[in-house]
Swiss-Prot record:
Source species: Brucella suis (strain ATCC 23445 / NCTC 10510)
Family (UniProt): Belongs to the alpha-ketoglutarate dehydrogenase family.
EC number: 1.2.4.2
Recorded catalytic activity of this chain's protein: N(6)-[(R)-lipoyl]-L-lysyl-[protein] + 2-oxoglutarate + H(+) = N(6)-[(R)-S(8)-succinyldihydrolipoyl]-L-lysyl-[protein] + CO2
Role, per record: E1 component of the 2-oxoglutarate dehydrogenase (OGDH) complex which catalyzes the decarboxylation of 2-oxoglutarate, the first step in the conversion of 2-oxoglutarate to succinyl-CoA and CO(2).
GO cellular component: cytosol; oxoglutarate dehydrogenase complex
Name this polypeptide is given: 2-oxoglutarate dehydrogenase E1 component
InterPro entries found in the cross-reference section: 2-oxogl_dehyd_N, 2oxoglutarate_DH_E1, 2oxoglutarate_DH_E1_bac, DH_E1, KGD_C_sf, ODO-1/KGD_C, THDP-binding, Transketolase-like_Pyr-bd
GO BP: any one term: glycolytic process
GO molecular function, one term: thiamine pyrophosphate binding
Cofactor(s) in the UniProt record: thiamine diphosphate
Keywords on record: Glycolysis, Oxidoreductase, Thiamine pyrophosphate
Length: 1004
């Protein structure tokens, strides 16, 4: 027994001896072993013994050194550049490197000992140790210096206890060593430096008014760029006298604006920027520096804090317009309809010019739901980037073309740390289908969330810590040092324009008043507000600094303030009689579109496509390149589709969709379809992107229809609903001529994005005069798949419907699906479309259409007749209208359940009428149809429970219609599942029993 126990011990001993052979040391060991093979005396005696004892052949040692075959190649990323390995803690390598360099210098006579003679071996070793310890200290500052930076203007933040890890003593340096020049190989822009010289640069760079976090970045080029940009004796925060005066001027404007409103509208909510005024010159710098580096457009998104100040001082919105709104006036002309919104939610756009570079700015309108505007801004920016390249591009726009449009997001500290959509947007930032060449995030960190202290609103030291997951550099900066804030904004902009990646500025400031101007903050933060009341404003502090520098006098500052106040007084007077001259919502890309009128007109648009064109598109849909290896199941799918095109019969759901997409692309409308697994389709029905089975190359038939067509993009999104839907909504705001679709994996999961439906899609047009043609495809249908795979909660969307705000449809034929998709682009206005889409109907033998139904004079039908009325070869022949005893109205898949059950029972006096579009409700069309059956009993049948589905919505509408036609039965009877808390049962037996019960109720 004892013998058997020895084996693991021996194995452990061997592992202990050889563990250094694994992973990252492989190259080094290989190199040593190769040297040993050539000449055993060329390596250290310990290594010589080790290699001799191994007695392995060279290949085995090499294999061991390389580690397992599944190890990720090129990872960890190899450090490149001088001494970068030191900064990642590979000290043995550094010591060797420095020793070699010092030996070389000694040999050339460049490095001298204390007596001025060439260095001895002992002195070289000491000098190398000094260098390594100095570099360890430099690394500590780069890693942890931000924790010691002077960031809090109020000085209330506790200093971290880091056990003096930044002190020279920690690295073996005593004051006696302070005069000695140490070789640091240009790490801080110096070849040699004393400890005090190093500390001077390090403290100024990492522990001043700016604290930089960048050592979590794994890309050596990005890391080296930041070091190069901020480290060194000549890299101080420095501005010209003109630059300093410009900063002062912007601060005076920002502070003066808030104070002016405070006097004129005492106690009115404005969510002032008081305490964070440095934001304004920082934003100016972002636009200015960006413009110099090729930036053409900035899409802003921000919360309420400081919004009016940004609108007026950065966006150039006339002050008179803002004062008009404070007075209670509308921001649109009187003849423009809309419910409006509070002034600190409104958007705006303008052009700014710096140094001859014109940059267009647009601020996106947003609700009070914090951070939800972020994905909308990113989507808008993506669409604008795409439009710069053109709609007929033949591939996704490369990343190098995207930096011309910058998404710029302003955040509150508590919201950035608290809202999940922030992490979702960061997750989108690097994905090919959603990247925007880097968003610039600016956190207005007033160190409080309404009344909650940071310790209770986040678990991490900084609000920005969530951004570390995507390795974004983070610049923490003291808001009371405007020059530092502007410098941080400049470097952040340069990083984004250089590397096309997100970057974060975290400006520590404070909120001089309460959460809003009617709030008393001392109830909950007495000490903080005591400090704030005693604290000078940023303008006072910066003014004193410039006076001390002799740049301005107090009289100059007083005059600047008086001039600004006079300008605001003039604007205030003008605001009393101000009239907005036009609504801006149909400018730019939206030119040529109009607002929709009468909700009940047909508004079909010309959606039919000639059969010849459809067949040409269909032919291309089933063609693949000769050398492309298609999966055999997909080949069968393509063969079936080719047969449909040949005969013009049996067009299924996915084929109708591809024909709609293809015909729109040929007509110049780009298609952007996004969502989880949309390339293939959740139910393996779509297959618009084909994969070669031998090399995984992609082929997209829809992008190979004809020259000059618009692009089709199918984007398998990340596993998120909220950010992705918000993003696609934003995209639809910027390009009205692109068909933008978001598909939920199942409709049940769409409520993960409920905020986007409630705050943007259903109400954006009425609140902010912003139209959208976004299509939401929500798979819906009760098939025994349980409570989370049955219901898109149709009732929720219907409850949101009013004032012709959007369309809700539940269509049953591929032809109607084809027309409703094309209708989105073929009218001169835009409305969102919420569609319940099928699952089992995707392959249902009856849910098919013909090419004839997509062409000629065909169009979308809001109501569809009973198939038995027209199809002579159907199983039953219906009675004449006068003999029909009951009309069963329904919507969606349940029609086919009713149809088959009726056929099975041989019933011929029950008429099935489908309501394909539930909103806008087709009242006139229903009056026409139901007039045929005035005498009949009316039933509404649905598969959803009674408290769900369309019943509650449609019941009053149907009652109105029946009264209008003077029907015999003035009330509609309900047939469907009884009310339920959960949408559907998870038991197939129960599902079938419920189905049988309501079919009996409807048809019996």
């Amino acid at each position: 027994m004892a013998k058997q126990e020895q084996a693991p011990d021996r194995a452990n001993d061997v592992f202990a001896l050889t563990s250094f052979l694994y992973g990252g040391n492989a190259d080094y060991i290989e190199e040593l072993y190769a040297k040993y093979e050539d000449d055993p005396n060329s390596v250290d005696p310990q290594w010589r013994d080790f290699f001799a004892k191994l007695g392995d052949n060279a290949d085995d040692v090499k294999k061991n050194a390389e580690g397992p075959s599944w190890t990720r190649k090129n990872w960890p990323i190899a450090a490149n550049g001088e001494l970068v390995s030191a900064l990642d803690g590979n000290w043995a390598e550094v010591e060797k490197h420095v020793t070699d360099k010092l030996k070389g210098k000694a040999a050339k006579g460049e490095a001298k000992g204390a007596a001025g003679t060439p260095l001895t071996a002992e002195e070289i070793t000491q000098a190398a140790r000094d260098s390594v310890r100095a570099i360890m200290m430099i690394r500590a500052y780069r890693m942890r210096g931000h924790l010691h930076a002077n960031l809090d203007p109020l000085g209330l933040a506790e200093k971290p206890n880091d056990y003096n890890e930044l002190e020279p003593e920690n690295y073996g340096f005593t004051p006696a060593d302070y005069n000695r020049k140490i070789f640091i190989d240009n790490v801080l822009g110096l070849e040699y430096a004393t400890v005090p010289e190093m500390l001077d640069i390090l403290k100024r760079t990492y522990c001043g008014a700016i604290g930089v976090e960048f050592m979590h970045i794994s890309d050596p080029a990005e890391k080296a760029w930041i070091q190069e940009r901020i480290e060194g004796p000549d890299k101080k925060v420095a501005f010209t006298p003109e630059g300093k005066k410009a900063i002062l001027s912007k601060l005076i404007e920002a502070e003066g604006f808030e104070q002016f409103i405070d006097v004129k509208y005492k106690g009115t909510k404005r969510f002032g920027l008081d305490g964070g005024e440095s934001l304004i010159p920082a934003l100016e710098q972002i636009v200015k520096r960006g413009g110099q580096m090729g930036l053409k457009e900035v899409v802003l998104g921000m919360a309420h804090r400081g919004r009016l100040n940004v609108l007026s001082q950065v966006m150039g919105k006339p002050h008179r317009a803002i004062f008009h709104e404070f007075k209670g006036g509308s921001y649109t002309p009187d003849d423009v309809e809309g419910s409006g919104d509070v002034k600190y939610h409104l958007g705006a756009s303008s052009d700014r010019e710096f140094d001859g570079n014109k940059v267009h700015l647009s601020l996106t309108a947003n609700p009070s739901h914090l951070e939800i505007v972020n994905p909308v801004v990113m989507g808008k920016a993506r669409a604008k980037q795409d439009l710069l390249v053109g709609r007929t591009r033949d591939d996704m726009v490369p990343l190098s073309e995207r930096p011309k449009v910058l998404p710029l997001l302003l955040h509150g500290d508590a919201a950035f740390a608290g809202q999940g959509v922030v992490a979702e947007c960061l997750g989108l930032s690097g994905l090919k289908g959603h990247r925007v060449a880097g968003t610039l995030h600016f956190i207005i960190n007033n160190q409080i969330g309404f009344t909650t202290n940071p310790a209770f609103s986040r678990s991490s030291p900084y609000p920005s810590d969530v951004a570390k997951m995507i390795e974004a550099p983070i610049f923490h900066v003291n808001g009371d040092d405007p020059e530092a804030v502007v410098f941080a904004a400049k470097v952040a902009t340069e990083f984004r324009m250089t590397f096309h990646k997100p970057v974060v500025i975290d400006m520590f400031c404070y909120r001089r008043f309460g959460h809003n101007e009617g709030d008393e903050p001392s109830f909950t933060q007495p000490l903080m507000y005591k400090a704030i009341r005693a604290h000078k404003t940023t303008v006072q502090l910066y003014g004193e600094k410039l006076i001390a520098e002799g740049l301005v006098t107090q009289d100059d500052i007083d005059r600047m303030k008086a001039d600004w106040r006079q300008k605001l007084e003039g604007e205030f007077e003008a605001g009393q009689s101000y009239k907005p001259n036009k609504a801006d919502w149909l400018d730019g890309a939206w030119a040529g579109l109009r607002t929709a009128d009468n909700a009940d007109e047909q508004r079909r648009g010309k959606t039919a496509v000639p059969v010849k064109t459809l067949k040409e598109i269909g032919k291309k849909l089933v063609e693949v390149p000769k050398d492309f290896h298609v999966h055999r199941t997909i080949q069968r799918f393509l063969d079936n589709r080719a047969k449909m095109m040949e005969t013009g019969e049996g067009i299924d759901w996915a084929t109708a969709e591809s024909l709609a997409f293809g015909s729109l692309a040929v007509e110049g409308h780009p298609i952007r379809l996004s969502g989880q697994d949309v390339e293939r389709g959740t139910f393996s029905q779509r297959h618009t992107v084909l994969y070669d089975q031998e090399n995984q190359n992609r082929y997209i038939p829809l992008n190979n229809l004809q020259k000059g067509q618009a692009i089709y993009e199918a984007i398998n999104s990340m596993l998120s609903e909220e950010a992705v839907l918000g993003y696609e909504y934003g995209y639809s705001l910027s390009d009205p001529r692109a068909l933008v679709l978001w598909e939920a994996q199942f409709g049940d999961f769409a409520n993960g994005a409920q905020v986007v439906f409630d705050q943007f899609i259903s109400s954006g047009e009425r609140k902010w005069l912003r139209m959208s043609g976004l299509v939401c495809l929500l798979p819906h249908g009760f098939e025994g798949q349980g409570p989370e795979h049955s219901s898109a909660r149709l009732e929720r969307y219907l409850q949101l419907c009013a004032e012709d705000n959007m369309q809700v449809a539940n269509v049953t034929t591929p032809a109607n699906y084809f027309h409703i998709l094309r209708r989105q682009m073929k009218r001169d206005f835009r409305k969102p479309l919420i569609m319940m889409t099928p699952k089992s109907l995707l392959r249902h033998k009856r849910a098919i259409s013909t090419l004839a139904e997509l062409s000629g004079e065909s169009s979308f039908h809001r109501l569809l007749w009973d198939d038995a009325q027209y199809n002579k070869d159907e199983g039953i022949k219906l009675q004449k209208d006068a003999k029909i005893r009951r009309v069963v109205l329904c919507s969606g898949k349940v029609y086919y359940d009713l149809y088959e059950e009726r056929e099975k029972r041989g019933i011929d006096d029950v008429y099935l009428l489908r309501v394909e579009q539930l909103y806008p409700f087709p009242a006139k069309a229903l009056i026409n149809e139901l007039s045929r059956f005035r005498h009949a009993e009316m039933v509404w049948c649905q598969e959803e429970p009674k408290n769900m589905g369309a019943w509650s919505f449609i019941d009053p509408y149907l009652e109105w219609v029946l009264a209008h036609i003077d029907a015999k039965h003035q009330r509609v009877r309900y047939a469907g599942r009884p009310a339920a808390a959960s949408p559907a049962t998870g038991l197939m037996s129960k599902h079938l029993a419920q189905l049988a019960a309501f079919l009996e109720d409807a048809l019996g």
